[in-house]
Amino acid sequence: MTCRTRFAPSPTGYLHIGGARTALYCWLEARHRGGEFVLRIEDTDRERSTQGAIDAILEAMEWLGLDYDEGPIYQTDRVARYLEVAEQLVADGKAYYAYETREELDAMREAAMARQEKPRYNGAARDLGLPRRDDPNRVIRFKNPLEGTVVFDDLIKGRIEIANSELDDMVIFRPDGYPTYNFAVVVDDWDMGITEVIRGDDHINNTPRQINLYEGIGAPVPKFGHMPMILDEQGAKLSKRTGAADVMQYKDAGYLPDALLSYLARLGWSHGDQELFSRQELIELFDVKDCNSKASRLDMAKLGWVNQHFLKTEDVAAIVPHLVYQLQKLGLDVAAGPAPEDVVVALRERVQTLKEMAEKAVVWYQPLTEYDEAAVAKHFKAGAEVALGKARELLAALPEWTAESVGVALHDAAAALEIGMGKVAQPLRVAITGTQVSPDISHTVYLAGREQALKRIDVAITKVATA
């Protein structure tokens, strides 16, 4: 049987970090087993579902590179199918119409609580065989088995059992003509041939009800794997402030998608002591059965370390589009400065995020208007104009402008003046960037471009002369 997994977010908000991990695990399980991955949008909550949230989820999936073989499939396009299955259950005596008012249901639950029992529906209409009629309170309820136990072997948590006496006859179709969550997902999984359901353990209480529904409609029951939640660094539930942010905020913060996926994979799964994984390694090694049953903690410092590794080792061409995004976010004209791939080469060893890389690269994409006073005082001393002038002379004469040729010219300038390389490099660094901190001097000058580099050296020579 072909492995088929599904990621089924509700479009009531952005895709947060926990949802991204769920999507990743579902995707990896399918890819590892040579199966298929389905994206399903569970949008039957009409009051809370929004098109903006749908768009945000799709954008995040695309950025993460989690491609799907089928979908997106929208539950709101399948309401007629859900009703068809629900009415067949009624015809088969496995479900029934009920018409209690809100007040009657509240009284029913209050009476149960007064008896110190679990507040739930008491099955009043279960055996009445009421016909379908127009009524604002009309629902369809599933006849949950009255006896026996639901048993399933969770792929992550092991064997779980719950007595049917703990469950009531749940509503499967609401008065508004829409299916409930538990019913819609079961029909979807049946129709879509889902073989493994991997999701957060906040859904674990739904599983016994859903298993009874699968069996009630005559569908094969998929395997279930429930992942523990991700906690913040203090061990508390994630909040927006502590990391439960929109996945796209991680993009804006300058993380590479492959770095984020590598980090997320380790938040609940492991392969020996290995800390870093390429996308292909994850596909080859992942097995949901290897997931941990205990909650993981989000560690932003660790994520930064992982991202730094990927910036240093990933192909330059793969990093460039993400750097361009960051440069454009800063309002920079990318065409007016150095090639982004050259910026990556110059800065990849010096930064932890792409946002930091872009901020350091600003000096090469816009005019230099400010100088660090301490840098000027330290390096624009009398005599610096000689080193700057010699460097300018040799740079202007270069037949080809490359980082290598620039480096040779600067060393030649130092040799010609019989001074240390630092006597040339430091005033030149201030001349080009306005500061005394930058990548190696050959890349710093090269990235400015010949025209801008010579202009900035001329300005610096004037500043030294008038100091």
Curated annotation (Swiss-Prot):
<dbReference type="GO" id="GO:0005829">
    <property type="term" value="C:cytosol"/>
</dbReference>
<dbReference type="InterPro" id="IPR008925">
    <property type="entry name" value="aa_tRNA-synth_I_cd-bd_sf"/>
</dbReference>
<feature type="short sequence motif" description="'KMSKS' region">
    <location>
        <begin position="237"/>
        <end position="241"/>
    </location>
</feature>
<feature type="binding site">
    <location>
        <position position="240"/>
    </location>
    <ligand>
        <name>ATP</name>
    </ligand>
</feature>
<dbReference type="InterPro" id="IPR033910">
    <property type="entry name" value="GluRS_core"/>
</dbReference>
<dbReference type="InterPro" id="IPR014729">
    <property type="entry name" value="Rossmann-like_a/b/a_fold"/>
</dbReference>
<comment type="similarity">
    <text>Belongs to the class-I aminoacyl-tRNA synthetase family. Glutamate--tRNA ligase type 1 subfamily.</text>
</comment>
<keyword id="KW-0436">Ligase</keyword>
<comment type="subunit">
    <text>Monomer.</text>
</comment>
<dbReference type="Pfam" id="PF00749">
    <property type="entry name" value="tRNA-synt_1c"/>
</dbReference>
<comment type="function">
    <text>Catalyzes the attachment of glutamate to tRNA(Glu) in a two-step reaction: glutamate is first activated by ATP to form Glu-AMP and then transferred to the acceptor end of tRNA(Glu).</text>
</comment>
<keyword id="KW-0648">Protein biosynthesis</keyword>
<keyword id="KW-0547">Nucleotide-binding</keyword>
<feature type="short sequence motif" description="'HIGH' region">
    <location>
        <begin position="9"/>
        <end position="19"/>
    </location>
</feature>
<dbReference type="GO" id="GO:0000049">
    <property type="term" value="F:tRNA binding"/>
</dbReference>
<dbReference type="InterPro" id="IPR001412">
    <property type="entry name" value="aa-tRNA-synth_I_CS"/>
</dbReference>
<keyword id="KW-0963">Cytoplasm</keyword>
<dbReference type="GO" id="GO:0005524">
    <property type="term" value="F:ATP binding"/>
</dbReference>
<keyword id="KW-0030">Aminoacyl-tRNA synthetase</keyword>
<protein>
    <recommendedName>
        <fullName>Glutamate--tRNA ligase</fullName>
        <ecNumber>6.1.1.17</ecNumber>
    </recommendedName>
</protein>
<dbReference type="GO" id="GO:0008270">
    <property type="term" value="F:zinc ion binding"/>
</dbReference>
<dbReference type="InterPro" id="IPR020751">
    <property type="entry name" value="aa-tRNA-synth_I_codon-bd_sub2"/>
</dbReference>
<keyword id="KW-0067">ATP-binding</keyword>
<dbReference type="GO" id="GO:0004818">
    <property type="term" value="F:glutamate-tRNA ligase activity"/>
</dbReference>
<dbReference type="InterPro" id="IPR045462">
    <property type="entry name" value="aa-tRNA-synth_I_cd-bd"/>
</dbReference>
<dbReference type="InterPro" id="IPR000924">
    <property type="entry name" value="Glu/Gln-tRNA-synth"/>
</dbReference>
<dbReference type="InterPro" id="IPR020058">
    <property type="entry name" value="Glu/Gln-tRNA-synth_Ib_cat-dom"/>
</dbReference>
<dbReference type="GO" id="GO:0006424">
    <property type="term" value="P:glutamyl-tRNA aminoacylation"/>
</dbReference>
<dbReference type="InterPro" id="IPR049940">
    <property type="entry name" value="GluQ/Sye"/>
</dbReference>
<dbReference type="InterPro" id="IPR004527">
    <property type="entry name" value="Glu-tRNA-ligase_bac/mito"/>
</dbReference>
<dbReference type="Pfam" id="PF19269">
    <property type="entry name" value="Anticodon_2"/>
</dbReference>
